Design a protein with these regions (language model features):
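Short beta->alpha connector loops at strand-helix junctions that form conserved
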Residues: 1-9, 89
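Hydrophobic beta-strand scaffold residues
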Residues: 2-3, 85, 100
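Structural signature of beta-strand start/N-cap positions in the alpha/beta core
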Residues: 61-63, 84, 111
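Glycine-rich Rossmann-fold phosphate-binding loop(s) that bind the pyrophosphate
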Residues: 67-68
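N-terminal Rossmann-fold NAD(P) dinucleotide-binding loop
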Residues: 71-72
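NAD(P)-binding Rossmann-fold cofactor-contacting core
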Residues: 77-97
C-alpha cells in the first residue's frame, strides 16, 4: 500500500481542530471536564472552582513546523487570535529563509508546537 500526500485536503477542518486543541490545552479543559464528571466541582466551598491553570491564547507563541496549506492556515488563524507565529526552518539548515525562524529557536520560544509536515527520512529526529 502506498501512502501519498493529499495537497489541499482538509485545509479548513484540520486548522480549526488545531485551534480547538490549543484552547483545550491553554484552558485545561480535560481537567475541568474530568472534575465536573466526577463531582469534584460541586465540592468547592466558594462560587468558583480553581484547580487548573487557565492561560490566554492571545499573546502566546505558536511554533509551526511545515508551511504548506495546513501550516499556513493554522498560522493565519493563530495570528487573528493575537498569537505570535514562528515558522520553523528545517533542522540543521545552514541558512534561514525569509519568513522562517531557526529550528532550535522555535523550540525555545514557542509555548505550543504544531506539526504539519510529512514524516520523511530527512525529517526524522
Amino acid at each position: 500500500m502506498t501512502v501519498k500526500n493529499v495537497t489541499g485536503y482538509s485545509v479548513t477542518t484540520v486548522p480549526e481542530h488545531v485551534l480547538g486543541m490549543i484552547f483545550a490545552l491553554k484552558h485545561s479543559l480535560a481537567g475541568w471536564q474530568r472534575d465536573q464528571i466526577t463531582g469534584k466541582w460541586t465540592e468547592s466551598k466558594q462560587f468558583c472552582y480553581f484547580d487548573y491553570p487557565i492561560t490566554d491564547v492571545k499573546g502566546s507563541t505558536l511554533g509551526v513546523f511545515g508551511k504548506g496549506c495546513l501550516g499556513t492556515e493554522v498560522g493565519r488563524l493563530a495570528e487573528l487570535l493575537g498569537m505570535k507565529v514562528l515558522y520553523a526552518e528545517h533542522r540543521n539548515a545552514t541558512t534561514c529563509r525569509e519568513g522562517y525562524t531557526p529550528f532550535e529557536e522555535v523550540l525555545k520560544q514557542a509555548d505550543i508546537l504544531t506539526l504539519h509536515c510529512a514524516l520523511t527520512e530527512t525529517l526524522k529526529i
